């Protein structure tokens, strides 16, 4: 009996260590970045971290995605992996519902209602997820077997294009400044100038460019205005003076005498406004280097003739993929160093309120993972998950358990809405996530690996 009980204790200790050790490795990298960028030491200036984030965005991450996803993907895998992008959509929908409950319970300031929903709904399904998977797979006791890292990175990369589309369409418009708040500020021109100076200040938080370098170059005429609210607010108005910023005839339809202008005038009022909003949606930003790398990997990997030329030990272009693989290996340490630099700035002052901050963090880091367990396990029992790989289910579960996406801070800055609140909330979420992720990774190991073993038996 004593031997049996000691064996159980040892097994539990191994399970706990298997979940703690990967995060400890990531914490070490983050602490190094924090010490290097801390204002008291300033061993590495903030500008260096901005350059490092640009390298991650434009080079390291695309190289990692292309080499790992391209080598793993096949036409059969695309069919088997269909639940990965669907799971991203499910996590966003369920997160939005939970975020709405947070609004009802915590009652944030009215101008932050949409912000609360967005920060609860959209998690970091990109860089942080890749870092967690890589750290787990570089542990000797990892339960996922050989080729763990390649499979995990492929699953995460296959989901990124869905998350990017959601951010640059749905999230972009949900994060526009509230109409009522904007009109109050608009009455006092001095206040507008102060807000614009703050948004364009060179001392903006590092998180603004942590996952979207060069964001200041992406600003458009209407990006910091309540564009959609004003467009559709003018539907019930017979006068165009209530919406002076958007030239529905001249700007989008050309000269008044042109055929296109005549066609636009014949459009229904609602359809014309939908078209204007669609033209103001930054769809072109979807084709960023990581997304392009994902598309190229899927295309090349799905065509056997192309894949045999690019991937494999005997491939004629294997020297190129080997070089890209070397550069891609720098992604995880670079991302964690940038995260440490972001955390070194500390939390900004926030008017969101302590109750709402705690509510969003609890909902995102504790409640949503529990709901995710129910969704993924139910999908597995219903036969919707065709892959028997435990890493597949592990990635699906992780998509529900990460902090809010750092990219949301960049969108907040681009829209001029809740920039300080996003910075403060992301700071505290990443601090609390150290505990929540440790707890849930241990649970996910048991659910994925033990369930798979029992199913084989």
UniProtKB/Swiss-Prot annotation:
Signal peptide: none annotated. The chain crosses the membrane at residues 16-36, 55-75, 86-106, 117-137, 152-172, 292-312, 323-343, 357-377, 394-414, 425-445. It is a multi-pass membrane protein. Keywords: Auxin signaling pathway, Endoplasmic reticulum, Membrane, Transmembrane, Transmembrane helix, Transport. Residues 1-15, 76-85, 138-151, 313-322, 378-393, 446-457 are lumenal. GO terms for cellular component: endoplasmic reticulum membrane. InterPro entries: Mem_transp_PIN-like (IPR004776), PILS2/6 (IPR039305). Expressed in seedlings, rosette and cauline leaves, flowers and siliques. Residues 37-54, 107-116, 173-291, 344-356, 415-424 are cytoplasmic. Belongs to the auxin efflux carrier (TC 2.A.69.2) family. This is Protein PIN-LIKES 2. It comes from Arabidopsis thaliana (Mouse-ear cress). The lineage of its organism: Eukaryota, Viridiplantae, Streptophyta, Embryophyta, Tracheophyta.
């Amino acid at each position: 009996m004593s031997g049996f009980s000691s064996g159980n204790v040892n097994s539990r200790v191994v399970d706990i260590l298997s979940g703690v050790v990967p995060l400890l490795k990531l914490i070490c990298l983050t602490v190094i970045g924090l010490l290097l960028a801390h204002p008291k030491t300033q061993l590495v200036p903030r500008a260096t971290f901005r350059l490092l984030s640009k390298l991650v965005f434009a080079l390291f991450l695309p190289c990692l995605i292309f080499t790992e996803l391209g080598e793993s993907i096949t036409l059969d895998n695309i069919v088997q992996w269909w639940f990965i992008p669907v799971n991203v959509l499910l996590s966003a929908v369920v997160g939005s519902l939970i975020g709405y409950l947070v609004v009802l319970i915590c009652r944030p300031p009215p101008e932050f209602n949409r912000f609360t929903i967005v920060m609860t709904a959209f998690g970091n399904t990109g860089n942080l997820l890749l870092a967690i998977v890589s750290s787990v797979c570089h542990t000797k006791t990892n339960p996922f077997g050989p080729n763990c890292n390649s499979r995990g990175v492929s699953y995460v990369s296959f989901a990124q294009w869905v998350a990017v589309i959601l951010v640059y369409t749905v999230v972009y418009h949900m994060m526009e400044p509230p109409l009522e708040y904007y009109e109050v500020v608009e009455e006092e021109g001095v206040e507008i100038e102060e807000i614009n100076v703050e948004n364009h200040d060179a001392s903006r938080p590092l998180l603004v460019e942590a996952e979207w370098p060069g964001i200041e170059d992406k600003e458009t005429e209407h990006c910091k205005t309540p564009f959609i609210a004003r467009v559709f607010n003018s539907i019930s108005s017979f006068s165009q003076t209530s919406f002076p910023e958007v030239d529905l005839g001249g700007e989008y339809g050309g000269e008044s005498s042109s055929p296109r202008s005549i066609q636009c005038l014949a459009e229904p009022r609602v359809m014309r406004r939908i078209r204007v909003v669609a033209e103001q949606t930054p769809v072109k930003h979807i084709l960023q280097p990581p997304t392009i790398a994902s598309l190229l990997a899927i295309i090349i990997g799905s065509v056997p003739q192309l894949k045999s030329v690019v991937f494999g030990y005997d491939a004629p272009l294997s020297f190129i993929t080997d070089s890209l693989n070397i550069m891609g290996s720098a992604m995880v340490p670079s991302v964690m160093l940038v995260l440490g630099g972001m955390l070194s700035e500390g939390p900004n002052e926030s008017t969101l309120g302590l109750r709402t901050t705690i509510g969003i963090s609890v909902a995102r880091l504790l409640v949503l993972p529990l709901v995710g367990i129910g969704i993924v396990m139910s999908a597995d029992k219903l036969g919707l998950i065709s892959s028997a790989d435990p890493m597949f289910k592990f990635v699906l579960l992780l998509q529900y358990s990460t902090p809010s996406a750092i990219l949301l801070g960049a969108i907040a800055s681009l829209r001029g809405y809740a920039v300080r609140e996003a910075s403060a909330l992301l700071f505290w979420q990443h601090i609390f996530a150290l505990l929540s992720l440790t707890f849930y990774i241990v649970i996910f190991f048991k659910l994925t690996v033990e369930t798979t073993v029992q199913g084989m038996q």
